[in-house]
Amino acid sequence: MFPKTSFTSLIVGVFLLYVLHTCWVMYGIVYTKPCEKRRAESCISPYLAAKPRLQLSVYTALRPNADGGHSLIHREEEFDVNTKFEKLVNVSLPKKTRKNGTLYAMVFLHQAGVSPWQDPHQVHLVTQLTTYMLPKPPEISLITGQDEPEKPDQQKQSSDSELDRPVSHWRSRLTLNVVSENFLFDREALPGDVHRYMRVYQSGKKMIYLPLLFVDELSNRVKDLMEINSSSTELPLTITYDSIALGKLRFWIHMQDAVYSLQQFGFTEKDADEIKGIFVDTNLYFLALTFFVAAFHLLFDFLAFKNDISFWKHKKSMVGMSSKAVLWRCFSTIVIFLYLLDEQTSLLVLVPAGIGSLIEVWKVKKAFKIHVIWRGLTPTFLFGKLDESEKRTEEYDTLAMKYLSYLLYPLCVGGAVYALVFVKYKSWYSWIINSLVNGVYAFGFLFMLPQLFVNYKLKSVAHLPWKAFMYKAFNTFIDDVFAFIITMPTSHRLACFRDDVVFLVYLYQRWLYPVDRSRVNEYGVSYDEKPKGKSHED
C-alpha cells in the first residue's frame, strides 16, 4: 500500500528537515523587524541618533555592586562608537584577590565630562576578571628530573598539594561592543534577548533606548588565563572595543547563553573553551560554512557507522581482509582515547572516542573469531580456526607486515627517544601515551598499506565494505576543509591529508579490479548485499 522506505532514506529525510529548521531558527535570531508604524509612541528610538558626546570608563571592584572600593583603570575621553581600539593597561590586584579571591570589572558608557555615578543616562555592565580553574600540573624532564624554574610561591603551592584545588586565574582580555546602527525597535515586537541589555527612558511622547553595551564573554579563552598567586601585585589587561551589528549581537547573546547553560550542567572552563573556539576563532561566514560542513559530517559519520556495523555483524569469513589492519585500528583508537583522557579533553570529544574504541574491540573479536567463555569470574578465550582461503589471505597480510616493520619500528622508537630527551612530560605514563599517539598520527596510515597489498595479491576488492568506505571518504574530504578552518595540532592536520592519499589508492584498485557482486567467486562467496527473495512455484 505504501512504498517501502529504507532506514537510510528516513535518516537523510530527518537530517534535511533538521537543517531547514535550523536555518529558519537562525534567520529568526539574526533578523529583527524594524518599527514601521507611523505613531511615535509605538516605536523605540535610539539615543545615539542625536550623536551625543560619550565617554567610556572601566573600573575594578571586589564586589559586583561596587558600593565603594572601585578603582578607575581606563578612561576613553572622546569615545566614538564607530572607532575600534585596543589598549593595554596594568591592573593592581587587591590583597583579597591575590589570596584566591575574585575581582570584577565595571564598564560605564556615559556622557563626556560627567561622572558615571551622576549621569541618569549612563549604561553599565559588570563582568568577572577572574575565574577558578585547576592549576596546570608541572612538567619535568624524565631523564634529568629538572623542571622549569618556578617562583617560591608556586613551589610552596605544589608542595602543599594544592594542585587538586581550583585557584583564581586572571582573564587577560576584556572585549567590549556597542551596537552602532540607529535601529528603530517596535515596542510590541521587542526581541527578548535584546530586552535585558536595553535601558529606556521617556522623552515627551517618544521612547528612547540608551546605547546597547555588550561584554563579549566568548572571547575569554583558557589560553589567555594567568594563574594568580600572592606575589602577583599587577597583571596586564587588554581592553578591546569594536562596534557590532544588531544581528551579530543577538546571535552572540544566544551562543553566550548556551555556553553558560553547559557550565551550569557541569561543564568545566576547559570544556566550555572548546565550544568558544568554534565561534571566536572564525568569522561568521566561516562559522556558517562550519555548521553545514559539521552537519554533513555528522550525517556521513552516522551512515558510515551504520553500514560498518551491518557489514561486520554479517561477516562470516576474513577472506581478503587484513586482520592486522583491524587489530591496528583497535590499538590506535584505544591509544587516542587514553591520550585524550590524559590531556583532560572535553567530554564532547572523549565520549565518542570511547564508544569508537569499544566498537573496534568488537571488530577484533569478529576478525579473530574469539569466543569468550566465563567460568565464574575467570574468562577463557577460544580462537576459531582459519580455512584454506583465509590462510592464504593471512600469508599475504603477514608478508606485508614484515616489510612494513622494517620502516615503522625504527621511526616509532626514534621518535619516542627524541621526545624523552628533549620534551618535558608530567609523568612516565604521559610520555608513553604521547609517544604512542604521535606514532599513530605520524605513521598510522602505514597500517592501511597491508590491506592494499592483500588487494593487489588477490586482484580483488569485493571483500571490502565499500558503502562505509565511501561515507568515510566524504568525511575525509570534509576533514580537509576543517583542517583549514579550525585550529588543531599540526600532526592531526597532516593526518587528514594522508588519509586522502590512501583512499585514492583504494579507488584506483576498485577501478583496476571491477566487481561483479552477483558472481560467486573461487571461494564460493557472493558479495551481493541484497538478499534474494525465495522462489515460489505456482
UniProtKB/Swiss-Prot annotation:
Indicate the secretion signal residues. Answer: none
Q: Where in the cell is it found?
A: Endoplasmic reticulum membrane
| Gene Ontology CC entries for this record | endomembrane system; endoplasmic reticulum membrane; membrane
UniProt key word Transferase: no
- How does this chain sit within the bilayer? Multi-pass membrane protein
The UniProt family comment states: Belongs to the CLPTM1 family.
Q: What name does this protein carry?
A: Lipid scramblase CLPTM1L
The scientific name of the source species is Danio rerio
User: Which lineage is the organism of this entry classified under, starting from the top rank?
Assistant: Eukaryota, Metazoa, Chordata, Craniata, Vertebrata
